[in-house]
Amino acid sequence: MLLTNREYEVLKLLVKGLSNNQISEELNITNHTTKAHLSSIYEKLKVANRVQAVVKYFELVKQKQLL
């Protein structure tokens, strides 16, 4: 599971609780692009939604596989 730099940025903002619109504004990308990044992140993390992605993020950080 290798996230691109941009996917990692999106994931970190997701973990902070930002909405898709807020992530789009923060990164100066379209909402469509944000959704595409999230879909890719979910697939790579083998999760189905935002909550599972956040849980998986913290599991990976704890295992030192993601910082």
Which sequence ranges carry the predicted segments?
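Regulatory hinge/linker segments at domain boundaries
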Residues: 1-9, 66-67
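Glutamate identity and glutamate-enriched acidic tracts
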Residues: 7-9, 25-26, 43, 59
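Short alpha-helical "packing" element that flanks the helix-turn-helix/winged-helix DNA-binding module
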Residues: 7-10, 14, 53
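Intrinsically disordered, low-complexity segments enriched in glycine/proline and serine/threonine
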Residues: 10-12, 38, 59-62
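Short helix-to-turn junction characteristic of helix-turn-helix DNA-binding domains
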Residues: 14-18, 57
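Recognition helix of helix-turn-helix DNA-binding domains
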Residues: 19-52
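Basic, Lys/Arg-enriched C-terminal extension of HTH/homeodomain DNA-binding domains
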Residues: 43-67
